[in-house]
């Protein structure tokens, strides 16, 4: 067997453009974000999420709901159904805080918190494996979709309804920004 050497060429690594060349870009980006943030036209409706970190009333409502779910001890599992930004933020946060073995810990070791599974694609094996593991009566479903019409969100909901029956909807929390227009 011939051994091949890997050569690393760093000659252009240190020849990066001076930061001054990017100042115009940063200024332009700041102006665009400021315009979006301060706009009173239709664009502001699409960027309402910008203010979410400052909406303490919404945070308090979510915290209160989560506290009730934990206190009632009715649920053991949480299944988050969403795609892209509707799922990735909570998934990254949960995985960065908890052990990768979180779902295998006892409820006592999880201090009463629920196990969490994410269905963020249309893979039938993933969906089947998650649904097979669940005790339906002990599962809360969190369905997140900006429009409520995303195929990758609707399909797992329809599968769950078929799998668990019409009572599935009684154990769902739907989060969408398109109130009144959502398909879910």
Where are the predicted features?
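Extended, charge-enriched "interface" segments that sit outside catalytic cores
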Residues: 1-72
């Amino acid at each position: 067997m011939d051994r091949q050497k890997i050569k690393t060429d760093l000659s252009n690594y240190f020849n990066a453009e001076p930061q001054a060349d990017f100042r115009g870009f940063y200024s332009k980006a700041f102006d665009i974000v400021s315009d979006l943030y301060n706009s009173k036209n239709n664009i502001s409706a699409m960027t309402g999420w910008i203010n979410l970190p400052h909406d303490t009333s919404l945070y308090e409502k979510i915290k209160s709901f989560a506290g009730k779910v934990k206190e009632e001890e009715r649920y053991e599992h949480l299944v988050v159904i969403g795609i892209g930004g509707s799922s990735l933020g909570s998934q990254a946060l949960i995985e960065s805080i908890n052990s990768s073995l979180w779902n295998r810990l006892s409820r006592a070791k999880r201090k009463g918190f629920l196990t969490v599974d994410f269905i963020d694609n249309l893979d039938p094996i993933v969906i089947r494996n998650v649904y097979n593991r669940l005790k339906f009566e002990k599962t809360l479903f969190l369905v997140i979709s900006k429009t409520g019409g995303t195929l990758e969100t609707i399909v797992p909901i329809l599968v769950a309804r078929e799998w668990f029956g019409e009572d599935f909807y009684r154990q769902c929390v739907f989060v969408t920004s398109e109130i009144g227009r959502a398909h879910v």
